[in-house]
């Protein structure tokens, strides 16, 4: 399958550990973060048991540190606890992680891994066509037809490289949320601003009145970690819950990771909390595109052709414009990018648009989008839908 050009490429890898059948091992090892792990608890583990387990794991690490086996390792660093998903990440020596994995409280362990951004194809200031396509039954129009509600009352979390929240196209609707990757609270890459401009910008966006929150999980080079992305998802879920936004929120994830149970679990927990998730399609069972309940998006060009670099398969919910998409860029600029990453925010924006227009809950959004979609995609891959995103404008 062709690799999409702007999807973030994650590689999840595992060490070979003796007698640890609950350790999820994968066959690629190039991007593993040495000695860094994500430990996922069983669903029946209570809050008290989770805290007791953390104390126990920390004690194991301190013992290894005294013995000189864990020099330079921090032990338990970050915990996750939202919507039934309990986990923690940390750096441990081999013997300690083997003991932790054998705990009766632990469901499985995955190696933490580097997140890398694939190369972007950029055509500066090219004409855009995506908004016209998603609001017309026939290809070729550049007019965007939409209801004036335009996502009003809906909040969209952009989990990405950050967002230039001061870009004039947002008109003050964008705010900074959290940064899990570095100390620079800005988009130094551009990808996150571009995707946000597509899902909610005033000029280039679908849901032009939605509120936007920047969740930075990748740095200027487009790199981060699985645990950092999960921190961003958890923060968004908790923020929505504590601010009365559950049921009125969406999340765009223009990123993915090679077949990851922990990533899928985090995405599913966010969806259960009352957030609609639009996710860029990946390659060979990428997560969270393979998670239950998320709306997985592949890419088409202006002629409704499935692009050669977009993923295909049964996990794809529908296609959306992803080739040569014009949107905003940091410092007041614009750029034209291509990729599945550009298709996903079109669907995220339509999801927010329909939530505002029809009052539907996040759990019903993807089905409603598929119901409205056009059977227009040409040459999709084997076992792949022909559905193309349409906002139901009637045009």
From Swiss-Prot:
This is Subtilisin-like protease 9. Residues 36-117 form the Inhibitor I9 domain. It is found in: Secreted. SUPFAM superfamilies: Protease propeptides/inhibitors, Subtilisin-like. GO terms for molecular function: serine-type endopeptidase activity. The gene is SUB9. Keywords: Glycoprotein, Hydrolase, Protease, Secreted, Serine protease, Signal, Virulence, Zymogen. It is an enzyme of class 3 (hydrolase). The keyword Aminoacyl-tRNA synthetase does not apply. It comes from Arthroderma otae (strain ATCC MYA-4605 / CBS 113480). InterPro entries: PCSK9_ProteinaseK-like, Peptidase_S8/S53_dom, Peptidase_S8/S53_dom_sf, Peptidase_S8_Ser-AS, Peptidase_S8_subtilisin-like, Peptidase_S8_subtilisin-rel, S8pro/Inhibitor_I9, S8pro/Inhibitor_I9_sf. PROSITE patterns: SUBTILASE, SUBTILASE_SER. Residues 21-120 form a propeptide.
